[in-house]
Amino acid sequence: MHANYTSANSGSSARRLTRRQVMRGLAVTASAASLSSVTSTARAVSSDANDKVRAVLASLVEDTPEIGLQVAAYLDGELVIDAWAGMADPAAGKPVDGDTLFMLSSTTKGVTATCMHLCVEKHGLSYDLPIIDVWPEFGAHGKQNATLRMALAHQTGVPQTPVGYTPEWLSDWDRMCRGIADLTPMFPLGQRTAYHSLNYGYINGEILRRVDGRTIAQFLEEEICRPLGIDGAYLGVPDRELGRVAVLTDGPPAPADYDARMVGEPAGSHVAEAFNRRAVMQASIPGSGGLFSARGLARHYAMLANWGVLDGVRVLPEARIRAGIELQTYEWDEIYRIRARRALGYRRGSDTGPLASPEAFGHVGGGGSFGYADPARRLGIGFAKNYFTYLSGGAVNGGRPPRAPSNIVTEAVFDALELPR
């Protein structure tokens, strides 16, 4: 089912165009405009491989509901894929380019996990640190035994949003943290996995703030982005970068039996309405609201794929990364109703497909974005899009449709780079 758009012409009446016709024309324009800029913005890109991947992105925009897409990949520490297609803002006729920022929903969690592991390393923390040692209020209503390990593994028992929550709370960090601290656990601490869609970011981010003194947004910028030269990873977009942000569009609503109360998304999945607000774009939402370019996300994972170092800059010791990716649970998730391989903040690889690798880790997000590292292949990859659908369909999210855009793009990257899969 396609929306109709009116196209002005020289006659007295307007011609009605389908969404697909509009997007096809805009995508062709955007692709033509970007062809000459690929190698100038990413000098390490192999043009042959990049052209193959870009063609796949363009076909997704033309033949499916997808609107704007980016993918970037590092191999052996070098940027080898940096491709994009489609529109960042269809209404304004603004195409995607390599610098466009996308709201990547829960893909943000993987970057947040990296911040937490670096905080643990810098401050000599234990993953079994009781949260109440740094955040006493969190112990209310039977949560006094919750630990940092549980927070990273979605086992603090509070996946539900605070009482009275509305999307306006997303731009009020202190209010969200007070509300989460006052929650009563729905599941036994440390015994049941229940995906903390929003709460994961606030719980871990507040632990970091109380330990380190900086917000997690500041920590990400100062400890990861600046040392690695990443331009395109934000937990709250500054004023100067607002013009880079892609407009989010909602796809079909969540299934009728989906309990939106637990993940903080309104019934019917009006995600775009909330996350297209300037106040929300500029808020720190480390569980599900980071804004990234695929290039920035991939560079972060390239560092992890090389066990903590990139371009001679060491961010994390290899031992810390190995501790962070150690499997914590492969149990039934009470929210998503699938078995999920979870490390400390990262998802682990699938049983089949490109990520059937013993060392692959990363995270997916609603809408189908993803980022991951595969040290065995020395690969870091990021995929961004602005058409938001309920199911992630991600390469690191086993059980999703095999022909989801995320899997199609992953396969295209592997094929273009002639990587085994």
Segments (PLM) and residue ranges:
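N-terminal export leaders
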Residues: 18-27
